[in-house]
């Protein structure tokens, strides 16, 4: 993994799946509290070579052990910049770009309000997270509008993906229970 530090102190690391980046944002403290800059378009573009035209910000609040995902969209794939405002999650992505040398590879990272990390998930990935604390607030920016007719769910515990989730018994939506294994998924 290759890391670089920007002029504002933010560290950016490209993981071993091309196009995926972890951002470590500095948190400045003084007697008044803290201040951080979670996103700067110019620095994001320079670091990722991707112009992110974010169209919407989303915030979900989850109970402990809630697992959301693994979601993706067919015709209108979303890039996502994700972070935790309160609590912590195990964030997981799966490369579903059929022509990618890392197709089917997963990546897992702990994101929390304490470690101040963000993850850039480019279009072409399934994404999900497991809430590790009560009342976790998960914030994410997306590059395409939500498209229910294009949304699909990759089964969270597909044995082929070998994801080491930090629970065996998550709280799931009906949609996520009915996800498909990768070899049965419709991909763009």
Regions found by a protein language model. Give the residues of each.
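Conserved metal-binding segment of the jelly-roll/cupin
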Residues: 111-134
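Non-catalytic, conserved peripheral segments adjacent to functional cores
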Residues: 2-114, 135, 140-188
């Amino acid at each position: 993994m290759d890391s670089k530090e920007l002029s504002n102190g933010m560290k950016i690391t490209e993981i071993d799946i091309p196009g995926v980046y972890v951002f470590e944002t500095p948190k400045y403290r003084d007697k008044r509290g803290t201040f951080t800059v979670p996103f700067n378009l110019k620095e994001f573009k320079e670091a990722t070579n991707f112009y992110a035209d974010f169209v919407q910000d989303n915030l979900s609040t989850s109970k402990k052990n809630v697992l959301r995902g693994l979601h993706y969209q067919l015709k209108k794939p979303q890039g996502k910049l994700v972070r935790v405002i309160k609590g912590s999650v195990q964030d997981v992505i799966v490369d579903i770009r059929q022509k990618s040398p890392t197709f089917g590879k997963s990546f897992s990272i702990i994101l929390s309000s304490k470690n101040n990390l963000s993850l850039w998930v480019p279009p072409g990935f399934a994404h999900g997270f497991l809430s590790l604390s009560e009342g976790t607030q998960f914030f994410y920016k997306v590059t395409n509008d939500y498209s229910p007719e294009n949304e699909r769910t990759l089964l969270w515990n597909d044995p082929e993906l070998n994801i080491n989730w930090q629970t065996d018994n998550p709280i799931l939506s009906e949609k996520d229970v009915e996800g498909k294994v990768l070899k049965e998924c419709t991909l763009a």
